[in-house]
Amino acid sequence: MFSRLSRSHSKALPIALGTVAIAAATAFYFANRNQHSFVFNESNKVFKGDDKWIDLPISKIEEESHDTRRFTFKLPTEDSEMGLVLASALFAKFVTPKGSNVVRPYTPVSDLSQKGHFQLVVKHYEGGKMTSHLFGLKPNDTVSFKGPIMKWKWQPNQFKSITLLGAGTGINPLYQLAHHIVENPNDKTKVNLLYGNKTPQDILLRKELDALKEKYPDKFNVTYFVDDKQDDQDFDGEIGFISKDFIQEHVPGPKESTHLFVCGPPPFMNAYSGEKKSPKDQGELIGILNNLGYSKDQVFKF
């Protein structure tokens, strides 16, 4: 699985990266905020799983791509840690001029044990309330956070291998998972990432992903898929979508000790696994993974 993959020439299927319909998640949070699986941590952790919002300042804003930025947030002290575990996320909040709360979940891309600060990679969506707000901020402005929220409780060596299927900013939770698995010398799980974007320039966290592949060639592999490589003659990936045939050829089958994690915009989710019904309900498994014979219990939707 980790040998050089043969190039496919599938007909390009554009990976829609339009506005993600996440307003329902906000309503769900406020209706069920006492039911989330919060993670409790020691006193040196900033986020303790309680109901307290913490205002944190932006220390740096960097351009990740033409429509995506990396925000670095400063923790209260240089020795502070987030308090997240694998795999978990945070809620971010701002209050509109009319007094309405806008809340969205975000997965930090920093090392979970990073001290003093953490980073979010955020894509700007046209009409997106939170992303428009964040893109209007500057260093020293603050954002309210709370959490952490457990998404999937990872247990080392639970599976022989896992496959991550992602598109766009869906890479964030997948990268968190991959990074911490391969960096753990006691976790022998092999990680295979299939990551789709419109162009090579849209590939997020590419530097970090390529570094993992170079450092841990026996544990981690990534294959990039783009609709159009444009003028990038150095692009060493696949042109087209992540096809059923490609998955069948390069991903461990449903009878093996494996698990699949999927994250991306709604069209991507519907094509491969179907969307979650809510943050607490994974919904039915449909799409390509269902057609390949994987069961609902073998696929997790971030």
Swiss-Prot record:
Annotated positions binding FAD: 158-193
PROSITE patterns cross-referenced by the UniProt entry: FAD_FR
Transmembrane segments: 12-32
One BP term from GO: ergosterol biosynthetic process
Catalytic reactions on record: 2 Fe(III)-[cytochrome b5] + NADH = 2 Fe(II)-[cytochrome b5] + NAD(+) + H(+)
Pfam family, any one: FAD_binding_6
The protein's role, per its UniProt record: The outer membrane form may mediate the reduction of outer membrane cytochrome b5, and the soluble inter-membrane space form may transfer electrons from external NADH to cytochrome c, thereby mediating an antimycin-insensitive, energy-coupled oxidation of external NADH by yeast mitochondria. Involved in the reduction of D-erythroascorbyl free radicals.
Protein name as catalogued: NADH-cytochrome b5 reductase 2
Organism from which the protein derives: Saccharomyces cerevisiae (strain YJM789)
Source taxonomy: Eukaryota, Fungi, Dikarya, Ascomycota, Saccharomycotina
